[in-house]
């Protein structure tokens, strides 16, 4: 574990021992990071109004923002990939999802298990998608069902980021 872990009020981030937070990333307040999860350079997870929960082996990539509003916690399941510069705001992302680079998911939205939100898609407030949805566009809509090949690609991405986090942790520990 490294990076910037900061309290807010009485809440301090809870980071699993095997999770990794990159230098330059900020994890603030009521945030829980699961085992082997990772938060990459320049990402911000700010749990100052409601909790943020990130499951096991989920990666929050460079430049992402995860935040919540009153009555809208941010929940991200296990084995998710949240691509560079995505915004996850007061919503629920079930396990096994891929959130594409630059996608935005707003308050009260729910992304079903094993779904893909395409790069730059905008999921409006309160919009819900069933499991295995391929979600595209502005505003987002379901285009089709996620294929087995796409599901395997998500799992491969999860494994890759678990390995990369371990590599970065080792390199930084060696060169600190």
Predicted regions and their residues:
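Glycine-rich hexapeptide-repeat left-handed beta-helix
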Residues: 1-14, 48, 54-56, 62-64, ...
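N-terminal first-folded block
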Residues: 8-53, 71
């Amino acid at each position: 574990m490294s990076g910037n872990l900061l309290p807010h009020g009485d809440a301090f981030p809870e980071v699993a021992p095997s999770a990794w937070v990159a230098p330059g990333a900020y994890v603030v307040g009521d945030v829980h990071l699961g085992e082997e999860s990772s938060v990459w350079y320049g990402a911000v997870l700010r749990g100052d109004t409601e909790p943020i929960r990130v499951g096991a082996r989920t990666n929050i990539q460079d430049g992402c923002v995860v935040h919540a509003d009153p009555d809208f916690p941010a929940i991200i399941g296990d084995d998710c990939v949240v691509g560079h510069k995505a915004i996850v705001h007061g919503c629920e992302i079930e396990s096994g999802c891929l959130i594409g680079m630059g996608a935005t998911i707003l308050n009260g939205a729910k992304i079903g298990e094993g779904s893909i939100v395409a790069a730059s898609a905008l999921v409006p407030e309160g919009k819900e998608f069933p499991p295995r949805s391929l979600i595209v566009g502005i505003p987002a809509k379901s285009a089709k069902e996620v294929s087995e090949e796409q599901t395997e690609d998500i799992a491969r991405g999860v494994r890759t980021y678990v390995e990369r986090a371990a590599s970065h942790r080792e390199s930084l520990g060696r060169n600190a």
